[in-house]
């Protein structure tokens, strides 16, 4: 099935004109069919809108935007990118989307602040013939494509790592863990939470659990303060934190409570600060999600959708994911990787995500990792 966008319709009109010229003796041909993930580029440019959700998490401005822009330039050198960040405000993202649609974008790549609220954006885009690619978070409303990571597996990876740490320390039966989950408006957070519970339930006692609006590190710190009061600092043997930013808040709360030997704390996103906490022994692990292939896939989907082609998923292949409205969305899901001190060099360093110099700043130069890395 081909998907017809406004740009694709204009391209079809151009193709019809070219065929008329061909009948008059001018040589012109058109091609169409199924778009494969790869290195082929589109000659005619169009306008692509990219909406990212927030800037508190370092990845979006540092990696997602530049990686997407790099891939789009490679796939469609003449394309024009319109970009906005919503700063975790759903209403702001709505206004940004409306402005882009008014400007005349031909395809929208949307990382929703609030998946349910984003259905309005999706419906407005569809009403104007503009296809929508859901990026990292699945917006409701029946988007054309979705690319993310296997989010249930992310939670499993975090839960498995936390259990492993507790088993290594022999503390799994000696106390309780605290769970600091992500934002209740982010469907990914629900998947992380479900995956973690699948691993942790029945294996450890969960003394306190919180959902954290806006993925706020400050809110996470407050929640951890509450958990320390209700559970007791000495009873907390581990903390499931859904991402690195909140892990920073968790660790700050533990330190403020006078906890000298920090329990294992999980994270996600492989932020540079998270990696540095791992090598400093403050955070047990993080989850590395290879953003470059995610951004590349989103760009491939956007180009295919805007030109009326059907994206085949490339090497990863397509699966289907059901959104909140029961729509089955063609999707690419990328596998996450657990990162501890032992495999930092084999993951984020070998992939070029960070260099040793970026990780081993003066404050961390004396850690075992940096000493061994030279």
What does each model-found stretch correspond to?
Residues 2-10, 24-374:
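A residue-level marker of the well-folded mature domains of exported/periplasmic proteins
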């Amino acid at each position: 099935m081909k998907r017809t966008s406004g740009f694709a319709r204009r391209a079809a009109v151009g193709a019809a004109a070219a065929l008329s010229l061909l009948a008059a003796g001018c040589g012109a041909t058109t091609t169409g069919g199924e778009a494969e993930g790869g290195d082929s580029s589109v000659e005619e440019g169009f306008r692509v809108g990219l909406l990212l959700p927030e800037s508190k998490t370092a990845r979006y401005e540092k990696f997602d935007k530049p990686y997407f822009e790099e891939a789009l330039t490679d796939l469609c050198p003449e394309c024009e990118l319109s970009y906005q960040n919503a700063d975790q405000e759903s209403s702001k993202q709505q206004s940004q989307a409306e402005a882009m649609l008014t400007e005349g974008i031909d395809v929208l790549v949307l990382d929703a602040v609030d998946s349910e609220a984003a259905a309005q954006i999706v419906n407005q885009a569809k009403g104007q013939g503009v296809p929508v690619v859901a990026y990292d978070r699945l917006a409701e409303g029946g988007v054309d494509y979705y690319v993310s990571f296997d989010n249930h597996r992310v939670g499993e990876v975090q839960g498995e790592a936390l259990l492993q740490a507790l088993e290594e320390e022999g503390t799994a039966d000696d106390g309780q863990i605290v769970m600091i989950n992500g934002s209740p408006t982010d469907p990914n957070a629900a998947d992380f939470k479900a995956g973690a519970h699948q691993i942790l339930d029945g294996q450890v006692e969960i003394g306190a659990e919180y959902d954290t609006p806006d993925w706020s590190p400050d809110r996470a710190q407050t929640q951890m303060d509450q958990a320390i009061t209700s559970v007791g600092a000495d009873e907390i043997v581990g903390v499931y934190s859904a991402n690195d930013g909140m892990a920073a808040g968790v660790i700050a709360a533990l330190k403020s409570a006078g906890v000298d030997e920090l329990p294992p704390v999980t994270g996600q996103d492989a932020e540079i600060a998270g990696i540095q906490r791992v090598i400093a022994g403050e955070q047990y692990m993080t989850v590395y999600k290879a953003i470059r292939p995610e951004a590349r896939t989103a760009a491939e989907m956007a180009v295919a959708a805007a030109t009326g082609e059907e994206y085949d998923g490339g090497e990863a292949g397509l699966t289907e994911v059901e959104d909140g409205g029961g729509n089955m969305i063609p999707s690419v899901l990328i596998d996450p990787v657990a990162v501890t001190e032992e495999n930092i060099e084999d993951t984020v360093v070998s992939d070029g995500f960070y260099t040793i110099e970026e990780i081993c700043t003066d404050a961390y130069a004396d850690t075992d990792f940096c000493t061994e890395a030279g």
